[in-house]
Amino acid sequence: MQITKDKLNIAVIGGGGREHAIIRRLAQSRRAGKIYALPGNGGISREHAGSDSCPVTCTGIAATDLEKIVDFVLNNEIDFAAVIPDDPLVMGLCDMLREKGIPCFGPSKAAAIIEGSKAFSKELMQKYGIPTAEYKVFSDADAAAEYAAHHSLPVVVKADGLALGKGVIIAKTHEEAIEAVNDMMRGGKFGRSGATVVVEEFLTGPEVSVLAFTDGKTVVPLPSSMDHKRAGDGDTGLNTGGMGVIAPNPFYTKAAEEQVMQSIILPTLNAMNAEGRTFRGCLYFGLMLTPNGPRVIEYNCRFGDPETQAVLPLVEGDLLEIMIATQAGTLDKCEIKLSDKSSCCLVLASGGYPEKYEKGKLITFDGDVEADCGVCIFHAGTKLGTPDSSEFVTSGGRVLGITAVRDTLEEAVRAAYAAAERVHFDGKYSRSDIGLSALRESRLKNG
């Protein structure tokens, strides 16, 4: 869909730290009129507060309430929508909006299946020769348990559908593997998402995340990154949505980058085109650099979180124009430059996350942390203490992300941690080793 209007009212679907980072960039576009977040969060509600140039309003409408979202968009003179989270994408929100004549950034339901079903993505990779782990798909619990019980260890058990980033179990014993299968397929741990499982080999090597804009023809990979998914230092503890990210990833060499482009990124886009599922939006490649070459661990049909908070500040250009070009099929005409700086996003979480944690804890800041420390603070699990309040309280497991951009990775990591010392709430928790393995690799590369 072509957009000729100069000033655009924009709806951004989502309410986490990733959406805060995206909204902050969209608000900088000369074409941004009003921005509405559905639902938004406490920090987003104070973005550009009192500004006439680009007011930002949070609606409180849940990102999965598709009918309400469509009604809001149609009744509030919205010119462009950006659907960010996985659930509404997999549920087909972009299709619903486009059917109503609303230009929309994000893949169709047919394309979002690349994340919505791990069985689909594994079979796509097998069919088109895209390197990934050896695997089998099961819809029968007995067969899955039998296969897992005799698989070499460790073995990976994955729920087929969306599971908030927690649907992957790395089993070190056969008992753990069988338990994972039973929890998903018999115990309903992830509902319908676990009715089918993928059992696959365990791969070793550095992990790399690569986000890429694509309109189905042109692809623009963004700076690589390294997520830290485990809750505890030294990659211990439970899987989380992500406790911190550094970018670029020093393990992702120029040679690896070229190999991934030729053996993974381009073949994936070509495969989706061949299947009649052309992907337009932001495609996330979760990779492992194994001794036998790069392998795909997972695809996501959207911006990663917290990868976006670290990567987006390294992307130069008008994000709104990039999004418009992506949905219009004109990405080849869009100017996108990538910074040569480094970034670190440190996540501050509620104590007990990702399991049981308390909410409603007052968040305080020692002065203007963003201005004083030269960082960006992106709100994830926050809300206003009262509707008219300027105080924030915690409302989720991952509360804030602090992003520092500096000339070197070491400086970025140090700056993010220094800023975090000036943010306070009861039970505040963060890992103390974000970027540590990357710094070691960087020092080895640079002597």
Name these PLM-found stretches:
Residues 1-109:
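ATP-binding N-terminal substructure of ATP-dependent carboxylate-amine bond-forming enzymes
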Residues 57-64, 136-140, 171:
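Short acidic-hydrophobic, aromatic-tinged amphipathic segments that line or gate anion-handling sites
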Residues 105-167:
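A conserved helix-loop-beta module that forms one wall/lid of the active-site cleft
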Residues 260-283, 300-372, 380, 387:
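Active-site "cap" helix and flanking loop/linker of ATP-utilizing ligase/carboxylase catalytic domains
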Residues 393-447:
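Generic C-terminus detector
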